[in-house]
Design a protein with these regions (language model features):
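Basic- and hydrophobic-enriched, low-structure N-terminal and domain-boundary segments
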Residues: 1-146, 150-155, 489-490, 583-584
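Short linear interaction motif-like sites in intrinsically disordered regions of transcription factors
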Residues: 16, 25, 59, 99, ...
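Short alpha-helical interface patches
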Residues: 45-49, 63-115, 211-221, 268-272, ...
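General secondary-structure edge motif
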Residues: 94-98, 120, 132, 136-137, ...
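A broad, low-specificity signal for short, low-complexity segments enriched in glycine/proline
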Residues: 96-105, 114-115, 119-130, 150-151, ...
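A short glycine-/small-residue-rich loop at the edge of a beta-strand within enzyme catalytic domains
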Residues: 105-107, 371, 407, 463
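P-loop NTPase motor domains
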Residues: 134-428, 443, 503, 511-535, ...
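Conserved ATP-driven motor cores of ASCE-family P-loop NTPases powering translocation/secretion/packaging/pilus
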Residues: 420-522
Length: 585
């Protein structure tokens, strides 16, 4: 019924145009009518009148004839639409079909070559979302060796058309593109967890604007340092640990000088918070520190959080302290102490100038330090949203693009699906790079479909994971095809017959998805037909000669703060604001 109404509305001008000739015929026939005429004599008279069609006469019968003709005309239209069936010839079992790469590129590519996002060799999308009303959130799926870095990540970085935060396994992209960024006037920062001696510094304390940010950071820290697959039926331990960490962090934020606000100091405070199982009344140096603060400020938020922790008995409190210390064990490493003691990242300036931050992580199973990158991303989102909403009252002046290579290796903040749905209005875009759909399901058990749904571009580069093949096949949909069946019987009265019918078929079956040519990629853009195109040839990039892939020297990073032995002998015992710990030890 809805289709019929839509069809009538679209054809209404045509039906209305025929009203004039209908009235003309009625007037012409009314002029031929005389009382006592049979239908045959009337038709003969009407036939003669048509030889002089503009000889019209108004008679007493003219209004009646006009009414009858219009009534018959309306009845004919009604009969036409009520007799229609809801048919879609050729689409009975599905309407999926392949689109044209050329037409899509013409629709989505910006005339300014530097203001696009590269999808494939012949398909690019403008960074101006108002032009095509699509967001610039992308999901890239491809197995090992499918070219996720070479055919998508690198070419887009080489455009140098935004600020970037890049997850860079092995540091491959930094070496290849770092010099190009410097030539383009970028501020370049590196957070290197493979070789911290070549890393710039990142201190989480520098991006805490309000007390609530402390709890967000601790929540991300605990989740990032909890082994995958580990489950606790009792949330008591994590909540108690959160209260302890929050108390220490809030104490440093409100009471300690800036140079002492770092994760190493928190670990030092925990080491001085020992509890005795047999003596619940024992007071550690840390207890005395908070007792002194309570005497001055009884309602201090750090004191209140510490009281929550101290509700645990001696044995339980000791277990909480041990658990908290184990999570912070990485900060006993001198090189980690150095790169987290101060801050060079300037996350808040990413949306105000061209800046690139490369987070270099191991591509092996060693993810022991990756929690630091997770914390950095959590605070980057907070800082970028603050700058967009409070400072610029809307969108950031410089677009910021988050390039999540090996997305599964770094845990993002809780509620990332909500962030993904709101970042576009702030001129923030993200590219999630996965090996298969299973990785996304493991990370976001309840929200994985929403994360894919929020991204208007989906690129599949090939792979060998079965559930991904099935998912891509379902995304592509079904088409309607013609089938032919034949039968033959032999013998004296043998016969042969053929039947033609239609049936539905996947545009690509899971097996065909698996066998996708390694040089091709499948691209799905919201509201468009899927297309297959060649992967981008990095050697044809206009800036290739300025990168390591094009023969230029590799970029070698020198940290802003030179790594010296003196940096490792930080005299924690001389911290003025917490020297009371030493006095009570």
């Amino acid at each position: 019924m809805r289709n019929q109404k839509k069809s009538f509305r679209s054809a209404a001008p045509v039906w209305a145009a025929f009203v004039v000739p209908i009235i003309w015929l009625a007037v012409l026939m009314a002029g031929c009518y005389e009382p006592g005429m049979t239908i045959f004599t009337l038709m003969d008279a009407f036939s003669a009148a048509t030889k002089n069609p503009f000889s019209l006469h108004w008679t007493t019968y003219t209004p009646k004839f006009i009414g009858i003709f219009l009534l018959l005309y309306g009845g004919a239209i009604l009969f036409y639409y009520t007799g229609q069936k809801n048919t879609r010839p050729g689409e009975e079992h599905g309407s999926a079909s392949w689109g044209s790469v050329r037409e899509l590129d013409k629709k989505y590519r910006d005339k300014d070559a530097g203001k696009n996002v590269i999808l494939t060799q012949h398909l690019q999308m403008s960074m101006n979302g108002k032009m095509h009303r699509r967001n610039l959130l992308q999901i890239i799926v491809g197995g090992s060796g499918s070219g996720k870095t070479r055919f998508l990540a690198k070419p887009n970085l080489m455009l140098a058309n935004a600020s970037f935060i890049v997850t860079d396994p092995k540091g491959e992209m930094l070496r290849a593109i770092g010099n190009l960024f410097l030539e383009e006037g970028y501020v370049l920062r590196v957070f290197d967890l493979i070789d911290p001696s070549k890393s710039d510094c990142y201190n989480p304390f520098c991006y805490i604007r309000k007390d609530a940010d402390v709890f967000k950071l601790i929540d991300n820290f605990i989740k990032n340092t909890t082994p995958k697959g580990a489950k606790s039926n009792d949330p008591f331990w994590e909540k108690s640990e959160t209260a302890l960490d929050a108390a220490l962090m809030l104490y440093l934020l409100h009471e300690a000088p800036v140079e002492d606000q770092n994760m190493e100091t928190i670990l030092y405070m925990i080491e001085n918070g020992g509890a005795k199982e047999e003596d619940d009344d024992y007071q550690s140096p840390l207890d005395l520190l908070f007792e002194a603060l309570e005497e001055e400020q009884p309602d201090h938020i750090a004191v209140r959080q510490y009281h929550i922790f101290k509700q645990a008995a001696g044995k339980t409190a000791k277990s909480i302290l041990v658990s908290a210390a184990v999570r912070l064990a990485s900060f006993t490493l001198p090189e980690i102490q150095r790169i987290t003691a101060s801050d060079d990242m300037e996350l808040g300036k990413l949306g105000e100038r061209k800046q690139a931050i490369f987070c270099i992580i191991p591509d092996s199973n060693d993810a022991s330090l990756n929690f630091l990158v997770g914390m950095l991303y959590t605070q980057a989102f907070q800082e970028l949203y603050y700058q967009a909403d409070k400072v610029h009252q809307g969108a950031l002046p410089v677009p910021v693009r988050l390039m999540f290579d090996e997305f599964a290796n770094v845990a993002l903040p809780d509620g990332y699906a909500r962030l993904q749905a709101t970042m576009r209005s702030r001129n923030i875009m993200s590219t999630i790079i996965l090996q298969n759909i299973s990785q996304l399901k493991a990370l976001f058990k309840d929200d994985w479909e929403g994360i894919i749904g929020n991204a208007d571009s989906f690129v599949y580069l090939g792979g060998n994971e079965q559930s991904t093949h099935k998912y891509i096949s379902e995304l592509l949909g079904k088409e309607t095809i013609d089938t032919r069946t034949s039968s033959q019987s032999k013998g004296r009265n043998g016969s042969f017959s053929q039947n033609f019918q239609q049936t539905g078929r996947e545009l690509m079956t899971p097996d065909e998805v698996r066998r996708l040519d390694n040089k091709n990629a499948i691209v799905l853009i919201r509201g468009e037909k899927p297309v297959i195109d060649e992967k981008y040839d990095i050697l044809k990039h206009p800036n290739i000669h300025r990168t390591e892939d094009g023969g230029a020297p590799p970029y070698l990073h020198t940290p802003l703060r030179a790594f010296a032995a003196d940096d490792l002998s930080f005299p924690i015992e001389n911290i003025d604001d917490i020297e009371i710990l030493e006095e009570f030890t």
